[in-house]
Amino acid sequence: MPNLHDIERRINSVTSTKQITRTMEMVAAAKIRRASERVANALPWACSISDMLISTAKYAPIDAEPLLQTHEQVKRALVVVVASDRGLAGGFNSNVLRHAEKLIKEKERQGVEVEVAACGKKAIGYFSYRGIKPVFEFATYEQAAELSLYAGDGYRNGKLDEVFVVYNHAKNAAEQTLVEQQILPINQQTYADLLGLNPKEEDVLEKYREDEKPLQGDIDFEPDAESVMFYLMKAYLRNAFFYALLDSAAGEQGARRNAMKSATDNANEMVSTLT
């Protein structure tokens, strides 16, 4: 049976750990606000790009943009997985990595050769341990732009037939939802429908759409609809990967705050039990 000195030492140890987890919780809470602002600022652009692309496609020949065409046979796919560099975030990384692995195995069972692009040390380490060498590793907007070129060129040249991105969407400060988005061929499901926006995000998007009311009547394209659509397609691909980075970063901080709050609560409960 532990004596009084042992109990006191245990209380001090738990209290010290609680101070660390409480500090990490507060840091994560501060980072959530900044990350959420970046996501909110990027959301109208993300939605507008996909809306404009779908609208412009109506004015261009059906075969004007190869990225809008569905390949008859799916032989090769690219799965882009967005995780984090650090742990201590509950099931944030494990959920997205397990889902990505499930998607990869499902495609392989269908006879599809799968390439993996990974964002975050956790994703890179997870797949490397399983003998899967990512064909692309990225963590910045510049690298996301390079990945978009790789995906776009691969699809145009017939080297890729499908492109997916898997990441955690920050539904709110306390909740993250898993997103599996088909990037190519372009999915006409809107970002709002895909992500299941919360009321605050819906208000931001609605205000933006009120300010940017669509033009009435015929639309003239310079130099032509095909050129505009080609530019929009490049912007769409860049944005798809970059938005996933922003959204995942906000979700990571929310998951870390939840994990640290749970650890702090457990520490308080243990101290109460020991005293």
Protein language model features and the residues they cover:
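C-terminal beta-strand-loop-alpha-helix "lid" module of Rossmann-like NAD(P)-dependent dehydrogenases
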Residues: M1-T275
